[in-house]
Amino acid sequence: MSATEGKVITCKAAVAWEAKKPLVIEDIEVAPPKAHEVRIKITATGVCHTDAFTLSGADPEGLFPVVLGHEGAGIVESVGEGVTNFKAGDHVIALYIPQCNECKFCKSGKTNLCQKIRLTQGAGVMPEGTSRLSCKGQQLFHFMGTSTFAEYTVVADISLTKINEKAPLEKVCLLGCGISTGYGAALNTAKVEAGSTCAVWGLGAVGLAVGLGCKKAGAGKIYGIDINPDKFELAKKFGFTDFVNPKDVADKGSIQNYLIDLTDGGFDYTFECIGNVNTMRSALEATHKGWGTSVVIGVAGAGQEISTRPFQLVVGRVWKGSAFGGWRSVSDVPKLVEDYLKKDLLVDEFITHELPLSQINEAFDLMHKGESIRSIIKY
């Protein structure tokens, strides 16, 4: 039994009091876990574009005040009543997509989108309807069921997975979102085949991870499409073979027509990792007539819609979406950790900056400027 079990813990957290404002480092109170909940001492968390998306005010589910963060790893501090899969001291990764193995979605075998706690998670509270986080007497909302921008957090016991204690938490925390998302989009969603041609729009962490997945599948050519050419040399480490800067070919008509001419008909697989509805269309229309598949990974702003001419689909192109790379979170993340430990999966190479919690706003600035792939906040 830990000295803090059953007690309220006061700790540091980065609080988003309102949209479009910098995070504020505050002392918050983290209540003990209730039934089927786990309290975790977070040791490291990544800073992801999804956190910035919600902070920007563009997220239709964005709630404030909130503790953001969803790419975290740590050590179990205590567990609530009925928790059997975890105990104090376990090394864990928080999961924004849970896995209950009981709901219609989990039982279908067709998706990783467990819906057991979807409604309460979207409402920023724990499954029983309240928050475990507060500051200055005010309730704070949870974020994506994880809230890892805090030294301690509470999650549902289906939103957590136990991992090998040999894995460095300050590295494998990234398997809680970005790397897994891109890597799995290539392997699980698109099911890229050996010798195929692929293109990735957006060479951030997710896009680079798509490249890794395409390389793992044996793709023959992997194109990176980005308006920041500074990313191209680094992307070669992740399997990319060719690069196109849309700004350089703007005088040649649409980017999709340029790419179709360049590749003798288009790509077998394309991936949109930006969240821009215009590039989503470009990615689809740059796939090969008859069999091309385009995977949407990036999240667009509230109210935005995608469009294309129906004939693009009639002639055999396929538009697909991918969340968390199609991985079944509780079952598959520990396997990805093992792949990392066996040096079969790059993780360290995504980390460009390590910062303390006090500098978390700097991590957002680096991301917005395109000067980082992933910044890690270490507690």
Curated annotation (Swiss-Prot):
Keywords: Acetylation, Metal-binding, NAD, Oxidoreductase, Zinc. Its EC number is 1.1.1.1, 1.1.1.-, 1.1.1.73, 1.1.1.284. Zn(2+) 2 binds at C100, C103, C106, C114. Its cofactor is Zn(2+). It comes from the Eukaryota. GO terms for cellular component: cytosol. The modification N-acetylserine is found at S2. InterPro entries: ADH-like_C, ADH-like_N, ADH_3, ADH_Zn_CS, GroES-like_sf, NAD(P)-bd_dom_sf. GO terms for biological process: alcohol metabolic process; formaldehyde catabolic process; regulation of nitric oxide metabolic process; visual learning. It catalyses: a primary alcohol + NAD(+) = an aldehyde + NADH + H(+); a secondary alcohol + NAD(+) = a ketone + NADH + H(+); S-(hydroxymethyl)glutathione + NADP(+) = S-formylglutathione + NADPH + H(+); S-(hydroxymethyl)glutathione + NAD(+) = S-formylglutathione + NADH + H(+). It holds the Pfam family ADH_N. CDD domains: alcohol_DH_class_III (cd08300). It is an enzyme of class 1 (oxidoreductase). Binds 2 Zn(2+) ions per subunit. GO terms for molecular function: alcohol dehydrogenase (NAD+) activity; octanol dehydrogenase (NAD+) activity; S-(hydroxymethyl)glutathione dehydrogenase (NAD+) activity; S-(hydroxymethyl)glutathione dehydrogenase (NADP+) activity; S-(hydroxymethyl)glutathione dehydrogenase [NAD(P)+] activity; S-nitrosoglutathione reductase (NADH) activity; zinc ion binding. Zn(2+) 1 binds at C48, H70, C177. Class-III ADH is remarkably ineffective in oxidizing ethanol, but it readily catalyzes the oxidation of long-chain primary alcohols and the oxidation of S-(hydroxymethyl) glutathione. PANTHER family: ALCOHOL DEHYDROGENASE, ALCOHOL DEHYDROGENASE CLASS-3. Belongs to the zinc-containing alcohol dehydrogenase family. Class-III subfamily. This is Alcohol dehydrogenase class-3. It comes from Drosophila melanogaster (Fruit fly). The lineage of its organism: Eukaryota, Metazoa, Ecdysozoa, Arthropoda, Hexapoda.
